[in-house]
Structures are given as C-alpha cells and as structure tokens.
Amino acid sequence: MGTLSVNQNKLQKRIRRLAGEAITDFNMIEDGDKVMVCLSGGKDSYTMLDVLLYLQKVAPIKFEIVAVNMDQKQPGFPEHVLPAYLESIGVAYHIIEKDTYSVVKEKIPEGKTTCSLCSRLRRGTLYTYADEIGATKMALGHHRDDILETFFLNMFYGGTLKAMPPKLLSDDGRNVVIRPLAYCAEADIEAYSQLKEFPIIPCNLCGSQENLQRQVVKEMLQEWERKSPGRVEIMFRALQNVHPSQLADRNLFDFKSLKIDDSATPRFLDVMSL
C-alpha cells in the first residue's frame, strides 16, 4: 500500500484512536496479557488484528498477540489464505480444525438459518482453546453496529435489554472476552478493509446468508442514520448512560421501598402564595 490520502489517513487514525479508547475505557488489555485474536477471515477480524498489532508497537504496556482461526470444514474453504497472510506479516497463529459444519447441517433443517448454532459451536471451541494455550484475553471483532443491532434484536425478539458488552467474563469464569472495535462504525471498518486489501474469506457454510431478524434491524438502523445522521452514535452512547430508576426492572432498582422524604427541601415554588 502506497502513501495514504488525507481522508485515508484520517480513517486509519480514527479507527486506531477509537479502538485505543475502548481498550482504555474497559481496561481490555493489561501488561503481560496474552491476547488470542479470533480471526475469521472477514473484514472485522482482519481490521481488529491490524489495529492491535499497531497498538502493540506504541502502547506503554507489553502484551502478546496470537491469531487463531477455526477451520470448520466448510466445503470450499480456502484453508491456505489465512496462514499465508499471517506468515507474510509475521504473526504467530494456530488453526483449529473441527468439523462443526457436519453438525450444523445435521441439526438444522434445510432452509433454516444456521448462524445461531454455528456461532455457539465456534464459541465453545474457542473458549476451550484459549484456556489450553493460556490466553488471558480473547479478542472478537464485533463493532459498534453489531452491539447496537444485538441490543434491538434482544429487545424486539427476546423481551430483554441487553447487547454485547465490550468486555465480558464467560459464564464459567475462565475466559475474558474483549471487543476492541466496540466504538468503531461498520462503515469505517468496511472502508479500512478495502484500503488495506485484506484477503477476505466469505462464509460458505450458509452461502453468506443473513440472519433475517438481524438484517431487518440492520436496515432499520441504516434508515434511521440516513434520515438523521449521527443517530446511531447517539443510541450507542445511550448504552453507556443507563438510569435504572427510570426503567422498570425491579431487580435493578428497589421501587417498592420508595417513600416520600418529609425532610427534603421543596423543589417547587408554592404558586398559591405568590
């Protein structure tokens, strides 16, 4: 890649800055960490690896990076692409070979979305492998738009207010998951991926099918952003500005104990005495 244009340089700086801010805000990476970067071959994970390699050079702390890809034995998967790329940039890597493709095809009826089961099988395998290699952090490539889409998916279809946290402790307490791109917009990542000419590998398991519910939410957010530029960022900031007393979850706020405080100073004027 040659000299960057002004806009390309701004894009690179923005992604690096936002990733650095997310890592700092949530204390994602600490001195001495071994970060397992989960590399799928998509634009998000390539961008995450690229940014982490840069931050590794300039950060005031020392941490190790190891890239891990899971070969799920999908027909036509170009298994040479990732090793060739990682060797070309000098990054240590592991390829996990596990035939989850056959499991998914066996369990999911023809025509149904395979994303959910595929994701669970992959996540479980990666958790186990991170433990085996002594990784202290497991980095995933989810970005701001993924997090917000998940929030609306859970609200619309699951009746719960939750998203993807930038930092997560696994249920068994053995893995810490981090999402360094949590503050980055998908459009920026797409542009950065094209700029860097990453060797993208499409998902052939399902013919690159979209999860239909997620696609509906994605299109909704895109339409909102088109009509009101900046709305997506405002909504994302709302996830960091939660007021439990203004919601209705009795587990988060003790509504039953609310009582009038007779000793409190009145906030309003006595209009009848004016």
Swiss-Prot record:
It is found in: Cytoplasm. Its main location: cytoplasm. It comes from the Bacteria. Keywords: 4Fe-4S, ATP-binding, Cytoplasm, Iron, Iron-sulfur, Magnesium, Metal-binding, Nucleotide-binding, RNA-binding, Transferase, tRNA processing, tRNA-binding. Signal peptide: none annotated. Its EC number is 2.8.1.-. Homodimer. The thiolation reaction likely consists of two steps: a first activation step by ATP to form an adenylated intermediate of the target base of tRNA, and a second nucleophilic substitution step of the sulfur (S) atom supplied by the hydrosulfide attached to the Fe-S cluster. This is tRNA-cytidine(32) 2-sulfurtransferase. It comes from Ectopseudomonas mendocina (strain ymp) (Pseudomonas mendocina).
